[in-house]
Amino acid sequence: MKPLYQELPFADDNYINFYREDLPHFIVPWHYHPEIEIMCIEKGWGTRFVGDHIGGYEEGDVCMMGPQLPHEWRNDKEFFDSDSGLRATCHCVYFRKELFEGILIRLPEMANIRELIERSRRGIKFTGESRERIARYIRRTFLSLIHI
């Protein structure tokens, strides 16, 4: 199946965009976009499709997808039952690729960031302390933004 191109809404001068989705089930089909994405699953479970990988996902999962990497999170069947009461909730952070271009990213101090971006081109599932810290930071940042 050919992935759909998704255009993400960014204000002209923003390089980072925070987004929260809370629905009976995830609705975005197999798609790709030029932005780097970090997705934190708050509620829900099902099947994750990232590039050529297929695997399960569950609450608490944190993944990073690089630019142009096709992906989809598909909830299990019970989420599509109208009286299930289940919710699919996630927090996403999108980074414009231009943020990681130019002289700054070439600095020696940015070597770990360059490696992370390169690895994200095939998708990264964070585990352990990294997963916990990233999820906590995304939730805290999102909450601070809605209270501005």
What name fits each language-model region?
Residues C63, S82, R122, A135-R139:
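Charge-rich, low-complexity amphipathic helices
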